[in-house]
Amino acid sequence: MNMDVNAVRSSIRGKHWFNVLTQNFEAIDTGIASLHVANGQLDGMEISVLSIVADEHNLYPRARQGEVGLLEGWSLAFAVDQIIQADRELEKKRSIVCIVDVPSQAYGRREEVFGIHQALAGAVDSYARARLAGHPLVSLLVGKSMSGAFLAHGYQANRILALNDQGVMVHAMGKESAARVTLRTVDELESLAANIPPMAYDIESYNSLGLLSNLLNVSNADEPTDEDIEYIQQALKNAFEDITLSGVNDLKHRLDAENRSMSKRVRELLREQWT
């Protein structure tokens, strides 16, 4: 069971950023209230924007605060696959933006029985296929990007951007859960994280792992100004241009950061042994 279930609070950041970045876009019916999709243009570039949002009336109680659950996983998989199929014959594929503000995957007995692992894997598969098919894929982290929810929605992107704000964090589990699992207090966990970047919750520590392409400074992450919106739109445009110029659709660049040197070395040694 997720020991953070009762601690999760609904965030509206993802929904708000989705709304301001998709003004005058065409809203796409996804069949569920917790997945928003819109198609439009960014400086003449065709893009699709996807975001998971809170739905207090979600059929599954464990997925009412913006978590990625059974419905969200399969709906993401279908929505992204629709994009792939629509552009299959086009030489230039449309770009995809994932707006990420997800507190967790949905934990519950029903989720386990009905196979949430398959639902989330379906979303991962569709995003990976889109990237490999040539769709430039950029994730914008505006809030929590936690656990399997982030793996299902956002992690497969060619480039990951994040707001440089204390409300943005990436981790495998919440602090309270991590403290219980490691038999520490939250204060002890934070002290440990100060010297071990993968254990930390702040976005700057995550950035040191080489997984982010850019940290973006905005004046107000909760209520972005017109200047903030223009700045983020330009950052997205720059990221898409960088993807196109690189001509690469894999994720190997994530291993180039200093704190990933041993990860890179392990892969090199395994490759030597297996070939």
Predicted regions mapped to residue ranges:
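Amphipathic alpha-helical segments at domain termini/boundaries
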Residues: M1-I28, A179, L183-T275
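N-terminal short beta-loop-beta anion/metal-coordinating cradle
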Residues: I28-E46
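Glycine-rich anion/phosphate-binding loops
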Residues: D29-A33, G66-Q82
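STAS-typified acidic loop motif
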Residues: D43-W74
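Short acidic, glycine/proline-rich loop/turn micro-motifs
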Residues: L59-A63, Y107-E112
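A structural preference for short, pocket-lining loop segments at secondary-structure junctions
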Residues: W74-Y107
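Conserved catalytic cores of soluble enzyme domains
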Residues: G108-I229
